[in-house]
Amino acid sequence: MIILGIETSCDETSASVLHNGVVLSNIVSSQHCHTSFGGVVPELASREHERLITAITETAINEANIQKDALDVIAATAGPGLIGAIMVGLCFAQGMACALNIPFVPINHIEAHIFSPFINSGANSPLPKEGYISLTVSGGHTLLALVKPDLSYTIVGKTLDDAAGEAFDKTGKMIGLPYPAGPVIDKLAENGNPNFYHFPRALTSRSKSRKSWEGNLDFSFSGMKTSVLTWLQQQSPESVASNLPDIAASIQAAIVDVLVEKSIAAAKHYNVSTIAIAGGVSANRGLRSSMQAACQQHGITLCLPETIYSTDNAAMIASIAALKLSHGMEPLYRYNVAPYASFLHKDNFS
């Protein structure tokens, strides 16, 4: 089966061709027009998707060395995300499916991330038999899901306020880093001291009140952001500039420690021996290193996506479409956009 995947949920325009679970092409164009605004501007994102989507799709098909009429299914992100951005990809994909008279599969963007560590394993290849804990962490989402052997899943932890990726970007902006600040913090932290300053780790064993975190798998990063801002207001600009790697390392440690501790706690609580990390922040080298060390300490297997599949991409859209179809999902010929978070059901795979 040959599947074309389309992804336009935020600020990446992407198209990918998948053949029997193997990625033949994965073209991603990241938008840089938002940098001066310090964040993604929805209207600009939509216009960029509209400008690029045809060329990106044609490039993906050409790189896969196939003709359009060889496609069996087209899949596209239907939510959650920016409504205008999603509409561009969704309408394009449905229009193309209609023109080719082939089925269409609407995809939950977060589900695609959850299963992205297993891209290229093939639609019929076995995933962890006992299920696994998925940590999906990005600029807009931070959640823990218990993925069961039948591929259904339950959300067992989520952010109560800000996503981890947002915490990276906003604290990075506070210390003068360009948007997106997450990758810059990661690079600076390589040469910094994570113990330079201890920023709070909310709802963890390092919290002041043990009762506030025991058994709690939710996340909170707003307090950490406020702590960074308050601390910076007490420092001179010269001091911040001269200690930038140490500050970046301290910020990263505060975020990573929470992500690692919650993931390990979830795996123990639900008695599974595999953790998979997904989403844009899964490309963070500090997170990968710390999670690997923690998993080795607790006898847990860690599954990581290839870095090219960490951020938003269409290969994960096509890949989960293949999984859904192989598990009995009936494809559609029409679907409406669903930008809201409730599109992510607690138990939803089919």
Curated annotation (Swiss-Prot):
The keyword Cytoplasm applies. It catalyses: L-threonylcarbamoyladenylate + adenosine(37) in tRNA = N(6)-L-threonylcarbamoyladenosine(37) in tRNA + AMP + H(+). Required for the formation of a threonylcarbamoyl group on adenosine at position 37 (t(6)A37) in tRNAs that read codons beginning with adenine. Is involved in the transfer of the threonylcarbamoyl moiety of threonylcarbamoyl-AMP (TC-AMP) to the N6 group of A37, together with TsaE and TsaB. TsaD likely plays a direct catalytic role in this reaction. Keywords: Acyltransferase, Cytoplasm, Iron, Metal-binding, Transferase, tRNA processing. Substrate binds at residues 136-140, 169, 182, 186, 284. GO terms for molecular function: iron ion binding; N(6)-L-threonylcarbamoyladenine synthase activity. Binds 1 Fe(2+) ion per subunit. Its main location: cytoplasm. SUPFAM superfamilies: Actin-like ATPase domain. It comes from Chlorobium chlorochromatii (strain CaD3). It is an enzyme of class 2 (transferase). Belongs to the KAE1 / TsaD family. Its EC number is 2.3.1.234. Signal peptide: none annotated. This is tRNA N6-adenosine threonylcarbamoyltransferase. It comes from the Bacteria. InterPro entries: ATPase_NBD, Gcp-like_dom, KAE1/TsaD, TsaD.
